[in-house]
Curated annotation (Swiss-Prot):
Protein name as it appears in the record: Mitotic-spindle organizing protein 2A
Pfam families, alphabetized: MOZART2
Keyword Cytoplasm: yes
Chain positions with Phosphoserine modification: S34, S152
Length: 158
């Protein structure tokens, strides 16, 4: 174990490329993420999102279980807001603001901004976007496709 002590430790200021390579190596050793998940994690890292691999794995698992990405995002946003409230005093009126818009996360600390970026990426890639669907029109307001009952163009003389 003395050989691992050589070089910069986790507390020192290592270049971002070295830190990313170190995280990648640790992930491969732990086998936390599958190959596809690793590719998605690397894309998130390349986009500037600094997120713990274990947290990323939890997010991916939630999305695989068809949990709505918006629900995951709002939960994480409220958790991050709770951490900020505990660490720094804020105006109580700021806590009651609605948490529905994604761009609010851009000015926050690195961790929550990274989570917001990953979740925004996941929201865009989710094909089921149930929160963005328009409600169906009731069938009573639709016109019948044929001219009327029994007047189908496919009916002919027999």
């Amino acid at each position: 174990m003395a050989a691992q002590g050589v070089g910069p430790g986790p507390g020192s200021a290592a270049p971002p490329g070295l830190e990313a390579a170190r995280q990648k190596l640790a992930l491969r050793r732990k086998k936390v993420l599958s190959t596809e998940e690793m590719e998605l994690y690397e894309l998130a890292q390349a986009a500037g999102g600094g997120i713990d691999p274990d947290v990323f794995k939890i997010l991916v698992d939630l999305l695989k279980l068809n949990v709505a990405p918006l629900a995951v995002f709002q939960m994480l946003k409220s958790m991050c807001a709770g951490q900020r409230l505990a660490s720094e005093p804020q105006d109580p009126a700021a806590v009651s603001l609605p948490t529905s818009s994604v761009p609010e996360t851009r000015g926050r600390d690195k961790g929550s901004a990274a989570l917001g970026g990953v979740l925004a990426l996941a929201e865009r890639s989710n094909h089921e976007g149930s929160s963005q669907r328009m409600p169906r029109q009731p069938s009573a307001t639709r016109l019948p496709k044929g001219g009327g009952p029994g007047k189908s163009p496919t009916q002919g003389s027999t």
